[in-house]
Amino acid sequence: MTTAKVAISADFLTACAHRPRQVQGKVTELVNKFRNDPASPGIHYEKINSCIDKKIYSIRIDDTYRGIVVRQSEVYLLLWVDHHDEAYQWAARKRCEVNPNTGSLQVFDVQTVSEPIAAHSQPLLF
């Protein structure tokens, strides 16, 4: 079996560093297991229905913590780690796109507008 290409974002490392040591160890174990076989049933690679971006999934670290992953072609990018609900809330606000000019993956917050944007009363000059 080929090893999956797994990348780790700086935000993932920062989020992991803020978790208890015991959880950090579990994250390391999971990353190694994920690299060897991302389709392993023990990883619980699952779609997050609340996400705007359908390429974002969760992986189970333990009963309490989840990792957030985006799959772009044959590369998995680990984005975030947090308590289950907080991780899902974080993921629901994100979108990932490949920059057409640089080829790099960009992760950004999605904002929703609660009111329609008013039409301009005067025509625009340009």
Roles of regions detected by a PLM:
Residues N32-I59:
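A short, surface-exposed loop/turn module that caps and links secondary-structure elements
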Residues T14-A17, N32:
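Surface-exposed alpha-helical segments enriched in charged/polar residues
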Residues M1-T3, Y57, I61-F126:
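Enriched for short, Lys/Arg-rich terminal
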Residues T2-A15, K26, Y45:
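N-terminal "first-domain core" detector
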